[in-house]
């Protein structure tokens, strides 16, 4: 729906306040960047620089503009020193960031990221999410993150939407989602680590901080 490959049967999908059905495909592509779940599917060129420059060149931007936008995208994702590297030799996490850089080079207002933290270790995952948080807070880019990693959702998302069998079953904050009032397992989701551990100790907690505080209180009470 976001990419206008399908049109909604009811309601609207708005991008920059405009219904997507009113956009020409090329104009919508300027507004939205998409990063695949499998980063290898987006690798088309022989250097990191050329990979990120692929989109701007397809739009026939000037060489100076391409150089500027690619440099900014590589800097934003921590890949500036790898501009001449062969993309397929990058680590999995670096390939993820390369996909984000390629999308950023077109200056989108919205980024759609499909399972962007899958297959990453804790350090790479943290680094990636901090990059995305910076893009959102400093550049005002809307991040739409498709994820089954509930720890990432709990920690970084401002709004959580849960779909089950194609239907909307939840739309609200992560704190409310994992606060104990909703049976997220019934929706096929795993509770964040803090919430799952809290359940074993007989109380609820939406964050690690809340879990530690309640556990200490429980211990003090004997």
Residue ranges and their predicted role:
Residues 11-19, 28:
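Conserved ABC transporter NBD signature motif
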Residues 86-90, 94:
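Conserved ABC ATPase signature
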